[in-house]
From Swiss-Prot:
Its EC number is 3.4.21.88. This is LexA repressor. It catalyses: Hydrolysis of Ala-|-Gly bond in repressor LexA. GO terms for molecular function: DNA binding; serine-type endopeptidase activity. The gene is lexA. The record marks 84-85 as: Cleavage. Belongs to the peptidase S24 family. NCBIfam families: lexA. Residues 28-48 bind DNA.
Amino acid sequence: MKVLTARQQQVYDLIRDHIAHSGMPPTRAEIAQQLGFRSPNAAEEHLKALARKGVIEIVSGASRGIRLLMEEETGIPLVGRVAAGEPLLAQEHIECRYQVDPAMFKPSADFLLRVSGMSMKNIGIMDGDLLAVHKTEDVRNGQIVVARIDDEVTVKRLKKQGNTVHLLAENEEFAPIVVDLRQQSFSIEGLAVGVIRNSDWS
């Protein structure tokens, strides 16, 4: 690991402390504001320098996509967009980690998934929520699952009958997704075990 300049150390310490206190990395704007930079672009340049020195990793496409590499990572990983054919928990899909005790969920949460859309709103799962997921393939009919259909990931209520799977929305405006197991690729990524709703985290 290369030696950090005093300014780079300030940025690194700010990121580490922000994660410790709020459970998530700061945005570029927050770094700029707290350290007196003229703009978020100045913060971005310092982040790039830290990334070149191997102490952080920048996750593209995420405003809080900063991962510390100097210390052992803790907390629950937030999974971002998943590329077709790749594992859900592949390192490159993890936007950041939230300092939440996995054991607060039963069974314990292995990862968080950002909810997109309102198909499950009738049971309180809203667009932008962070869905806590226990990674397992052992699920039963009627449970809320994270499923992958032909490389598309979705959150729905499971109903399996023979070679047919019905993935049911909890919103009357959304039709069920019907999967023919003889013709389509289908897998269970996990069981929904809770929801985190915080406008600051979305």
